[in-house]
């Protein structure tokens, strides 16, 4: 596992992207990678994918506030954007998600071996080829959470997973998004949104619709 502590400050050391698992390069565009035949430069003043500081206003297209862009689910050969339309189809569900969902169900039923096998099928598939996990109990669930976060990144699951697991008020309170600001080869760890996230526990439950309360005087709204 890569130690990122050096990049939680300011350094001229190049991030060890080549030491990360294959899904990193398949998920994001970063400085030094290629996209549509261009070498990407996500630094201040970069010619392809320049950095732009966070602000609570509109942004210019083709710039980043984190030092990274999204690559996942995009086909370099198909991208053709016209206004709000694109030739890129949205992938609603993948087989990897099916396997992970089933693995979690097996875990809840105390079927440890089945849960391990299903998650390891995701990790060991062609193009990823990562060793399997043999943990069990709470340790397995922690591994599973991390696996799901990586495998399903940017597919719209993490927020709802955290709600489903009742962990959002722990993971998201006082949380900020961070990134790397690159200036003349210097990497600076920065806040990307300028504010702490908040998740009060009342958000785990949706309010009772006003129409239902009007229909039945015995129904009361949640206190929170």
Task: Please name every model-derived segment.
Residues 20, 24-29, 90-122, 141-151:
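Extended, hydrophobic/aromatic-rich amphipathic alpha-helical segments that build helical scaffolds
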Residues 2-5:
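Surface-exposed intrinsically disordered loops and tails
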Residues 16, 20, 66, 118, ...:
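Alpha-helical structural motif
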Residues 68-74, 117, 124-127, 149:
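Charged alpha-helical initiation segments
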